[in-house]
C-alpha cells in the first residue's frame, strides 16, 4: 500500500486528518505510528487551518525542508484555501470529503520526497 492509501485508511479508521498523515509517514520519520500521531499538529490549530495542511508542512519541515514552499503551492492550487471550515464546505459542494483531502495531501508529500 502506498502513502495515499495508508493515510486514507488511517482516516477511515477514526484518526483526524493530521494524525492520519503522520501515521502514514511514521516509518519514514523513524518512529512508530503511535509516536507519530502524538507529535502531529492539532487539527484547526493556527487560526483554523486544515490539519492536513499543517501536517503536510510539518512532515516536510522534518523530512525535506526545501520542499515546503512547493507543498504550499500545490496544496493551494488544488484547494484554494487552507482553512478547515471553508475546505469542508467547498468539498461538500464538490461531492468530496476530508478523506479525499488526506489522500491528495499524502500524494503531494510523497511526490515531493522523491
Where are these regions (language model features)?
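C-terminal binding/interaction regions
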Residues: 67-114
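Glycine/charged-rich beta-loop-alpha catalytic/anionic-binding loops adjacent to active sites
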Residues: 1-6, 32-42, 86-90
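Active-site-proximal helix-loop elements at catalytic-domain edges
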Residues: 1-26
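Alpha-helical support elements that line or immediately flank enzyme active sites
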Residues: 23-25, 59-63
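Acidic-glycine-rich active-site phosphate/pyrophosphate-binding loop
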Residues: 21-39, 76-84
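Glycine/serine-rich anion-binding loops at beta->alpha junctions
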Residues: 42-58
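Domain-length accessory/inserted modules outside core catalytic folds
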Residues: 31, 45-47, 60, 79
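Generic structural signal for well-ordered, non-membrane alpha-helical segments
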Residues: 14-18, 36, 46-49, 64-68, ...
Amino acid at each position: 500500500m502506498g502513502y495515499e492509501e495508508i493515510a486514507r485508511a488511517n482516516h477511515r479508521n477514526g484518526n483526524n486528518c493530521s494524525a492520519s498523515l503522520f501515521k502514514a509517514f511514521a516509518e519514514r520519520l523513524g518512529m512508530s505510528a503511535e509516536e507519530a500521531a502524538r507529535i502531529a499538529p492539532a487539527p484547526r490549530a493556527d487560526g483554523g487551518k486544515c490539519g492536513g495542511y499543517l501536517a503536510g508542512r510539518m512532515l516536510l519541515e522534518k523530512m525535506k525542508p526545501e520542499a515546503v514552499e512547493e507543498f504550499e503551492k500545490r496544496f493551494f492550487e488544488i484547494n484554494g484555501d487552507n482553512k478547515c471550515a471553508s475546505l469542508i464546505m467547498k468539498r461538500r459542494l464538490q461531492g468530496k470529503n476530508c478523506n479525499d483531502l488526506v489522500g491528495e495531501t499524502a500524494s503531494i508529500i510523497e511526490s515531493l520526497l522523491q
